[in-house]
From Swiss-Prot:
PROSITE patterns according to UniProt: RIBOSOMAL_L31E
Keyword Ribosomal protein assigned: yes
Family designation: Belongs to the eukaryotic ribosomal protein eL31 family.
Domain of life: Eukaryota
MF terms in GO: structural constituent of ribosome
Keyword Zinc attributed: no
Name by which UniProt lists this protein: Large ribosomal subunit protein eL31
Gene Ontology cellular component list: cytosolic large ribosomal subunit
Organism of provenance: Perilla frutescens (Beefsteak mint)
Keywords: Ribonucleoprotein, Ribosomal protein
SMART domains recorded: Ribosomal_L31e
A single BP term in Gene Ontology: cytoplasmic translation
């Protein structure tokens, strides 16, 4: 049983790296809707993984998805999702998730699992 003094798991501030398979999420999608649908799927993935409804997508990640056009979205993407505290006093949510693109190692994406990242801040 959990300790009474410990916080719930979804309340912690944490960063993790994930590999998202966009190919299976966009299969059968109309060509002209692929890139917008990919952004929506990344948001949905981050909501489920981090348990926050407020998900913010980084500009570099958006540019990476759109880099090959609206039709040719990358099959897989490595992202870093950070759950952070909301400093705004009048914010609806206490926590938000920031999704950024992670660097891909030269060995490729095979064998990489979910990794917890230590905060540099």
């Amino acid at each position: 049983m959990a300790d009474k003094g410990s916080k719930p798991r979804k309340e912690e501030v944490v960063s993790r790296e994930y590999t998202i398979n966009l190919h299976k999420r966009l299969h059968g999608c109309t060509f002209k809707k692929k890139a917008p649908k990919a952004i929506k799927e990344i948001r949905k993935f981050a909501q489920k993984a981090m348990g926050t409804t407020d998900v913010r997508v980084d500009v570099k990640l958006n540019k990476h998805i759109w880099s090959r056009g609206i039709r040719s979205v990358p099959r897989r993407i490595r992202v870093r999702i950070a759950r952070k505290r909301n400093d705004d006093e009048d914010a609806k949510e206490e926590l938000y998730s920031l999704v950024t693109v992670a660097e891909i190692p030269e060995g490729g994406l095979k064998g990489l699992g979910t990794q917890v990242i230590d905060e540099e801040e």
